From Swiss-Prot:
Family: Belongs to the tryptophan dimethylallyltransferase family.
Encoding gene, per UniProt annotation: nscD
Pfam families found in the cross-reference section: Trp_DMAT
Protein name as catalogued: Prenyltransferase nscD
GO biological process terms on file: alkaloid metabolic process
Function: Prenyltransferase; part of the gene cluster that mediates the biosynthesis of neosartoricin, a prenylated anthracenone that exhibits T-cell antiproliferative activity, suggestive of a physiological role as an immunosuppressive agent. The non-reducing polyketide synthase nscA probably synthesizes and cyclizes the decaketide backbone. The hydrolase nscB then mediates the product release through hydrolysis followed by spontaneous decarboxylation. The prenyltransferase nscD catalyzes the addition of the dimethylallyl group to the aromatic C5.
Domain of life from the UniProt record: Eukaryota
Annotated organism of origin: Neosartorya fischeri (strain ATCC 1020 / DSM 3700 / CBS 544.65 / FGSC A1164 / JCM 1740 / NRRL 181 / WB 181) (Aspergillus fischerianus)
Enzyme kind, highest EC tier: transferase
PANTHER family in alphabetical order: INDOLE PRENYLTRANSFERASE TDIB-RELATED, PRENYLTRANSFERASE ASQH1-RELATED
Keywords for the protein's UniProt record, in alphabetical order: Transferase
Amino acid sequence: MSPLQLNGKSRGTSPGNAEPLPIFDALCRSLPVGTADEQFWWKLTGRHLARMMLEAGYPEHRQVECLLFHRFKVVPTFGPQPQSAEPWYRSRVAASAGDGAPISYSWRFGTADRKPYIRNYIEPLGPLTGTAADPNNDVATRAFLQDLTTTLPNLDLSLFWTFEPHLVSRFSDKADREKYAGPSVLTGVELSPDSDAIEIKMYLYPRIPEQISQLLSTIIPKAMREAYGDDVCLDSLNLVKDFLSNHPDGRQLSPRGTTGIDCCKVQDSRVKFYVATNNTSFDHIATVMTIGGRRPLSTEVLDKLRELWYELNGLPSDFPTSEQVPTDQGQEGPSGHHGVGFYYDIQPRLALPDVKAFINVRKHAKSDLAAAETVIGFLERHGQGHHNPRAYLNVLRDIVPAEELETRVGAQAFYSVAVKKEELDITAYFIPQVYRRFASVQVELNGQRRSRFE
């Protein structure tokens, strides 16, 4: 019998982290085997999740709870295991930074009053995924959400179901269905260490390009009025719309199309509107983060933000803040510099939206390890090392061998940066490398690879 089918006796190895995972291993010995596909995804992503929670210091009972949820609610949605380095269906998870796998991860490093915590991003796959019967992969997602309504008592999908018909296109014409085929909905699964709840986020993406330009002006306001009532306060949304329309820096922002929604009580939920810019000067980034000065940030915070941006890009401290990040003219491919992403966090009860920046590791760092060391060193220097940010390196080494982390980019997708109480709140987004490292993953899961540290 193949090791992939033998639960508890061949659980595979990690590429570079030989430390045991006692809770994961105990569950592997006790849980039902399931299908060969489920075993593949459980052995790979279950181990990753177990490593993340162990390194982040999750209580043992919470580790068990989250692993069981992952095994029985999430893993069965991943569909067939890979048969080659080319995905049978290319998921939109992690967008341009992903390799087509239906899952990615994030690690929030934590702030003075909040511990590190983990989130997974998934796209459920089903028998109709990628076929003419389900060109936008709606069926599997709807089935997954229906299943969650019987499992998660805190789940409230009312805002999502209100927004969904405004943002997800339906096509009656065959030519249009084929033209606009592709995923339109993703799911975020948030696993907080200090809660017994599992929180769900939904991300909607219109397939018709013309819709993207209408999001702020028409589509989102209409959906918000339907959700909250005709008298809903749209001050936060209108502020963002005015900045993008009238401010010189705002006019450089392009909507990306993604709209994020918290699946909790409507009055507590947020609507996240994503944009991007090709301008890499720090002055521009700071202006976008402050919404043209309407959401002021202290000099200390801006200095920290500039320090992090310069270090990730390898810039000297006296590099002019008005200048764009230099691009190696002879350099081709994904490592060239192409700007920064942001989202504006819109809530009817708040007049000012929160802002978060997204820095693409493949475009703004020499290697995955260099980026991680830069972020960790920054946190330690600025008194944010109380949650042991270096534990994140153990997570990366459980996914990718050390020499690949030192010489390549690809394991990490983004770092996001927000401001919380004068601290930079940083989150790392990374991917399991299911297809990009297809051959190595097959060997590792069959337990034939020695540790890279041996």
